[in-house]
């Protein structure tokens, strides 16, 4: 029996439909409804938001399928869910459940410290994190239909997401300016598939959307990432760790859409209550850096 898999064109097209929007982490149906009402283009169903995963320690795994099912029943927008890096069975279970996207996520404890999933082997589209063009193109080479910056999840600190977005976009400009005879060396240096390096040279951009994620905690953070070239924004702990989640969620969505309307962003930021406290990066131990969990 021939195995059914989705084509890159279809998967990437589905991801393109989320462009310009906000995707919010939720842990129950009530939060999912708040996200949908605020204007989120999709939700990420998980058992704990990244800040709680970070605080709890231990091994973080795929969410209880009951949570994912409850979220899927509660909203009409697409539902994503996270699987551990390299965990084929978690990903197959989520695919069988009918989720719209799977995030092969460094927020969860990796199941395989050497190999990522062969995402082209699945029908469902995948989202993956990246810090630079090498990671981005390796994930696309495996079949990812959508990328996001890794940032540093659960910190409420935007600095790493900014670093990763600037790094990827700077390296795209570098490749776009190369002559054809320099591309093979670029593929070697970046550890990236040659055909995808050539595609970057031709397009002048990634062949898939690249969202900002990891540390978005305020409307201004979301707008900043759009200014830097993000195709949209993931918000993890920032919304439901704030004092007023519904108001905060709506403000993030509007700031993402109207990211150059600074007067509006100022108004949206008024009287939101306190955002999540956040963590200064220098206070993180090297072993606690989630962004270093994949390669």
Swiss-Prot record:
Its EC number is 4.3.3.6. It catalyses: aldehydo-D-ribose 5-phosphate + D-glyceraldehyde 3-phosphate + L-glutamine = pyridoxal 5'-phosphate + L-glutamate + phosphate + 3 H2O + H(+). CDD domains: pdxS. The keyword Lyase applies. Pathway: Cofactor biosynthesis; pyridoxal 5'-phosphate biosynthesis. The active site is at 82 (schiff-base intermediate with d-ribose 5-phosphate). PROSITE patterns: PDXS_SNZ_1, PDXS_SNZ_2. D-glyceraldehyde 3-phosphate binds at residue 166. One of its GO terms (molecular function) is amine-lyase activity. D-ribose 5-phosphate binds at residues 25, 154, 215, 236-237. InterPro entries: Aldolase_TIM, PdxS/SNZ, PdxS/SNZ_N, RibuloseP-bd_barrel. Keywords: Lyase, Pyridoxal phosphate, Schiff base. NCBIfam families: PRK04180.1, pyridoxal 5'-phosphate synthase lyase subunit PdxS. HAMAP family: PdxS (MF_01824). In the presence of PdxT, forms a dodecamer of heterodimers. Belongs to the PdxS/SNZ family. Catalyzes the formation of pyridoxal 5'-phosphate from ribose 5-phosphate (RBP), glyceraldehyde 3-phosphate (G3P) and ammonia. The ammonia is provided by the PdxT subunit. Can also use ribulose 5-phosphate and dihydroxyacetone phosphate as substrates, resulting from enzyme-catalyzed isomerization of RBP and G3P, respectively. This is Pyridoxal 5'-phosphate synthase subunit PdxS. It comes from Listeria monocytogenes serovar 1/2a (strain ATCC BAA-679 / EGD-e).
